[in-house]
Amino acid sequence: MRIATLALLGAATMGLSACEKTGMDTGTPMAGGQRATAMLHTADGTDVGRATATEVAGGIRFTLDAKAMPPGTHGAHIHTAGRCDAPDFATAGGHWNPTGMKHGSMNPQGPHEGDLPNLIIGTDGRGTIGITIPGATMAGLLDADAAAFVVHAAPDDMMTDPSGNSGGRIACGVFQAG
C-alpha cells in the first residue's frame, strides 16, 4: 500500500511539473504586486492583442489575448528591448534571458525566461497564452530599456538555440508599467 501511495504521489508531482512546461497558468497575484501591459500590433499598425505581465509569488504571470491574427501555431517570446520598430521588429532584440540559459523548454540547458508556449490561433483569428515564469522579476522586465512581447510567423520547436526556428516577427508590443 505504501509503495502504491508513493507511486501515486510521484505521478502527481510529474503531472504538476508538466503543467508548467505546457503553459498552464499557476501563479497567484500578489497583493500590491506590479503589473505591465503590452498592446500588440503588426508592422502596418493593426491592433492584434494585449499581453499582461503580473507579479506573482516567486515569478511573473504572462497572459496574451490575441485577435485578428493568422490561424496556426506561432512562437511567442518576451524580448529584451522595449522597441517594436516596423517592418520586422528587430529592434526588440533577442529573447529575454537574464539567467544565460539556452533556448527552449525541451532543451536540457534551457529555457530562457522569455520562452513562452506556442500561441495557437484558431480560424477566428483568436488565441490565448497563460503561463507563470518562476524566478522572473518585474525589475528585470521593466529595466531601463524595458521589454517586448513578440509573436513569430512559425511554431517554436522548443529546442533550437537561440530562437526555436520560429521565423519572422509578425506582431510586437512594448511592456509599460501600470
Task: List where the protein language model places each region.
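C-terminal motif of bacterial Sec signal peptides marking the signal peptidase cleavage site
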Residues: G15-A18
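Sec-dependent N-terminal signal peptides
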Residues: L6-A12
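N-terminal leader/targeting pre-sequences
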Residues: I3-A4, E20-T73, I78-G178
